[in-house]
A protein has these predicted regions:
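Hydrophobic alpha-helical transmembrane segments of membrane proteins
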Residues: 1-67, 85-223
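Short helix-to-coil transition segments within interhelical loops
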Residues: 74-79
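Alpha-helix N-cap/helix-start motif at helix boundaries, enriched for small hydrophobics
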Residues: 81-83
């Protein structure tokens, strides 16, 4: 635990020193949509934690520079502890980002009377925190697998591929009326609670797989 505490302190110091611009951009985007759009509470509540979930993986790139790994592993830190700390750090930061997003969404509702942030929406936001943890886990796995500039390029490419696949599947379903009706009928037969549980389980599964994969990647790394 001593090694994890030291790594957490390092990453928090690095994040707050390098993340000032990130918070400025997040605040600007949130303010812009609050002033210009009609329905922004949900967007803000999702946008802020999603950006932070992706950004937490950037601490890995700083560890790679100037033989940082060699220095870290000369301390009471091994590869398993290093990966474990990255996931703990991403969990803390993503949870904090989620809380900030919900608070900002609540402020938006107070500022703009036409906004609605009902209990159903809050329940949905509780589910999204698991999704963001899965995103953070995937980000860490990619950054560990692809070092330096490769990691910076692979991550947006992977996101684009996922969106492209989702768009292709959505277009195919929309064009196939029979399949669309079958899917809608199946969804109508499933309650909201079952869908929520399925999303949580799927997110936790993705997070766990990314953790196991990150452990294997780190074990094979050569410095």
């Amino acid at each position: 635990m001593k090694g994890i505490r030291g790594l957490l302190e390092k990453d928090f110091r690095l994040f707050f020193r390098q993340g000032g611009n990130l918070f400025f951009v997040l605040a600007f985007v949130a303010l812009f949509f609050t002033l210009t759009e009609k329905e922004t509470a949900t967007f803000i509540a999702i946008y802020i934690p999603s950006v932070i979930a992706v950004y937490t993986g950037n601490t890995i790139s700083y560890d790679e520079n100037n033989h940082g790994y060699m220095y870290l592993f000369s301390l009471p830190v091994n590869r398993k502890v290093y990966v474990r700390e990255k996931y703990i750090f991403s969990f803390i930061m993503t949870a904090c980002g989620w809380c900030i997003g919900v608070i900002c969404a609540g402020i938006t509702v107070l500022i703009k009377p036409e906004e609605v942030f009902d209990p159903e929406m809050l329940a949905m936001e509780l589910i999204t925190i698991f999704v963001f943890q899965a995103i953070a886990g995937i980000t860490i796995a990619i950054r560990l697998r692809f070092e330096g500039e490769k990691g910076r390029l692979v991550l947006p490419i992977a996101i684009l591929i996922v969106f492209a696949i989702c768009y292709a599947i959505g277009s195919f379903v929309m064009d196939n009326l029979g399949l669309k009706e079958s899917i809608l009928y199946m969804i109508e037969g499933i309650g909201d609670f079952e869908i929520a549980i399925a999303l949580i389980v799927l997110s936790l599964l993705v997070w766990f797989i990314s953790y196991i994969y990150s452990m294997r990647v780190m074990k094979k790394k050569e410095f």
